[in-house]
Amino acid sequence: ARPIMLLENESRVVDDGLANIILSKEEESIKAYASELVKIRNGKEDYETCLKNMHTRPYYGAMMIKLKDVDSAVGGLIYSTADILRAAFKCIGAKPAIKTISSVIVMHKDDEQLIFTDPSTVQKPSAEQLVDIAANAISFANMMNMNSLGAFLTYSTNNSGKGENPDLVREAVKIATERGLNVINGEMQFDSAYDLNVRKAKFPSAVQKEAGVFIFPNLESCNIGCKIAQRMGKYGAVGAILQGVNGAINDFSRGATVADVIDVTSITILNGYTFK
């Protein structure tokens, strides 16, 4: 891989051996990319709006991926997750046959690796969207040779609780089972999903195998769960890693460590090879 650093102006250039693209010197390519984005947006945004967006690194990098000028891109230390996601959605879009773009975070400690989804993309998914999110995460787990058994989470285990979220999650489990996804046959609280002894006591009819993919009922709960695992459980977090986008682009938290940046970049480069 040949890394390229996107910079707004020359004042941010660091002599670190990387190739640099200085946006303030790329007016011709910015105009060309903006014209392409107008075509992609198909009347939803005019040229002036696209040109303004293309002067930012998220949009310029996303368009480089779209036009195959680079294989992959990462960002997020300065720009927000929303900035990266908007650029990815508008410039690149979803893979063919993908209805829902989502994200995963790999939580890791010692030899343990778990996938949490969806921490950054779909705020309040429907049952169908939740199944799409699960399918995306399971596919990612398989690509990474990780445990891909999925567990749908809520505050109910095997019909023990009632309410909007348990009902939605039960519907998602039903749809996922009908679609043949590799998931445990019922909704669960986190303790039942994570601890086989608890699951055996609370839900003896469920699959008694360790789950590797934890599907939260909404973005809020997943995001909170990731932060609790990081800060109180001392888990490392790699991501968020976008799923379902028709190109290799990812975002890391503005609080990311050097190790986080290296991990997300490595996964993004690996993902880039799948689009060649």
Predicted features and spans:
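Anion-binding alpha/beta catalytic cores of soluble intermediary-metabolism enzymes, centered on
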Residues: 1-4, 8-276
